Amino acid sequence: MSGTILENLSGRKLSILVATLLLCQVLCFLLGGLYAPLPAGHVTVLGSLCREDHARQNDTSFLLYSRGAGACIPVTREEVEQDSTKMANELVHVFQMPLPRDLRDLDYSRWQQNLIGVLQVEFGYDSSSELREPPRELQLTIDMRLAYRNKGDPDNGWKLYAHGVEHRYLDCVTSHVGPTETLYSCDMIPLFELGALHHSFYLLNLRFPLDTPSQMNLQFGHMHDLTLTAIHQNGGFTQIWLLLKTMLFPFVVGIMIWFWRRVHLLQRSPALLEYMLIYLGAALTFLNLPLEYLSLVYEMPYMLLLSDIRQGIFYAMLLTFWLVFAGEHMLIQDAPNKSTIRSRYWKHLSAVVVGCISLFVFDICERGVQLRNPFYSIWTTPLGAKVAMTFIVLAGVSAAIYFLFLCYMIWKVFRNIGDKRTSLPSMSQARRLHYEVPLDQKVEDWAGIVYFYTKAFFFQLHKANESKGLIYRFKFLMLATLVCAALTVAGFIMGQMAEGQWDWNDNVAIQPTSAFLTGVYGMWNIYIFALLILYAPSHKQWPTMHHSDETTQSNENIVASAASEEIEFSHLPSDSNPSEISSLTSFTRKVAFD
């Protein structure tokens, strides 16, 4: 009578499998910690001032640059101060990226994937001005022109990438009070976001037009220093990340094919948990697919959006699977009907579906619009910033609540199994030894359980005459599920905060380390890889007879006793109860009678 590999695999083989997977997990952490740089880097660029010809102010193809042949003549701050109108409608703030280093021009690499720009504004008022304190949520109108050129292009070969007149709202504080003017420093504001870093050099021209009839920018005195922070993904991290994806992708595809083939060899339809496992493997395969290689050849500004969609699908599938995984082993219902997502889990999964749809809509509103206008950001208006912050906070709170609910479900599974263990003394020896490893002392606390798991996996389970201890194997797997869920939730919350920190607070420095990111990503693959192996149907018959001169007769009696109990348990799904895929689920559904 066959079951799953989890219950039929020998202790020696199980120990080797667990040790190998743990070694792979350690290697994933070391790969990010020892060889990968930080996931993201940034360059701070101080804007250069250039004076524009009035005749070409409306010519969007006219671009000013500060380095190279044909560069503009820079305007000093003293010249601006001496001008009676502060050169209103004539000044252009120029930012050229990346900056040179050691008298050598640097260029962006396509391995760096994306580019985000945030701006910090500093402006001042004359001390004689009546408007000494700027109002909060001060509206600033900016004429933005983003251009690019590649290696081999002439210094003046800039091509317009995007142009727009956008509004930004500033919150400023007094930074310096002098005898002639008062300076104000403002919070960082999002400026642009490029989903593909396809070109070698980028140029940004900023103009702050003044217009009396429309009251445009009249609340400002005069601009001082403008600082642009250009954030990019580190190319070295991208290479390590794609290397990890490239290595993991074929292994997951291979184990999925192997798992589904073993399921279809059985004379039954796949169970719900088996369907969920193959769906989870498919979502992970979609996430592992190294599509980023295409961005090294083609310009794909939608890659950020596509990456978010792929990760969102995986998160939704993983969260759904954990609820079903715990629920299928609770089995507290008495109805013999076949388990389905709609019949049993619609209440639990409705929150997951609503949360995923909300985040998808939020992402489309942000990065979907940026495909057409890279200067757009939902953070630019006070209302949009509050909505975006609300989404981030709710996402983090929801993730924490989900983890607590999952802990509660797994606790109920453990309690349910503990209640059913009271029936073990009434079972035959073969049936009892299949579920529980004989212990010298009771293991009731968590520390004892963890100690026993280690002992059972690496010392006792390899002995041929020892019991397989299905209950403790399952509990070990559930604890591994909790660890995986905890790290996933922590990574999700840190990712949301790291993504939004440049938009809502420049004083917060949150950046997940490369070791954490590669470790969690490897953990997802290793965890799902292990589930596909352990929950695959086994072709081994149970129980196995051990022949020796002293034990042959007793084993024959045990097997005969176990055979008489086959009517009490069903290791694999049957027509009457198709949701059971292992003897443990049968054990949690009914009490055996010896």
Swiss-Prot record:
Region spans: Disordered: 571-594
Intervals, Lumenal compartment: 35-239, 292-311, 366-390, 495-514
Keywords: Cell membrane, Cell projection, Developmental protein, Endoplasmic reticulum, Endosome, Glycoprotein, Golgi apparatus, Membrane, Postsynaptic cell membrane, Segmentation polarity protein, Synapse, Transmembrane, Transmembrane helix, Wnt signaling pathway
Membrane side Cytoplasmic: residue ranges: 1-13, 261-270, 333-344, 412-473, 536-594
Transmembrane segments: 14-34, 240-260, 271-291, 312-332, 345-365, 391-411, 474-494, 515-535
One Pfam family here: WLS-like_TM
Compartment list: Presynaptic cell membrane; Postsynaptic cell membrane; Cell membrane; Endosome membrane
Positions of glycan attachment: 58
Tissue distribution: Ubiquitously expressed in the wing imaginal disk, increased expression is observed in a stripe at the dorso-ventral boundary and other regions of the wing disk that express wg. Also expresses in the leg imaginal disk. During larval development, expression is seen in both motorneurons and muscle.
Listed GO CC annotations: cell projection; early endosome; endomembrane system; endoplasmic reticulum membrane; endosome membrane; extracellular exosome; Golgi apparatus; Golgi membrane
Predominant cellular place of this UniProt entry's protein: membrane
GO molecular function: Wnt-protein binding
Residue spans of biased composition, Polar residues class: 573-588
Gene Ontology biological-process entries: compound eye morphogenesis; cuticle pattern formation; Golgi to plasma membrane protein transport; imaginal disc-derived leg morphogenesis; imaginal disc-derived wing margin morphogenesis; imaginal disc-derived wing morphogenesis; intracellular protein transport; positive regulation of protein secretion
UniProt note: phenotype after gene disruption: Segment polarity phenotype (cuticles are smaller and lack the alternate naked regions) and wing margin defects (a reduced number of posterior wing-margin bristles and the even bristles distribution is interrupted). Heterozygotes die as pharate adults with appendage malformations, such as lack of arista and antennal segments, rudimentary legs and wing-to-notum transformations.
Topology versus the membrane: Multi-pass membrane protein
Domain of life: Eukaryota
Function: A segment polarity gene required for wingless (wg)-dependent patterning processes, acting in both wg-sending cells and wg-target cells. In non-neuronal cells wls directs wg secretion. The wls traffic loop encompasses the Golgi, the cell surface, an endocytic compartment and a retrograde route leading back to the Golgi, and involves clathrin-mediated endocytosis and the retromer complex (a conserved protein complex consisting of Vps35 and Vps26). In neuronal cells (the larval motorneuron NMJ), the wg signal moves across the synapse via the release of wls-containing exosome-like vesicles.
Subunit structure: Interacts with wg; in the Golgi. Interacts with Vps35, a component of the retromer complex; wls stability is regulated by Vps35.
The family this protein is said to belong to: Belongs to the wntless family.
PANTHER family per record: INTEGRAL MEMBRANE PROTEIN GPR177, PROTEIN WNTLESS HOMOLOG
Name of protein: Protein wntless
Gene name of this polypeptide: wls
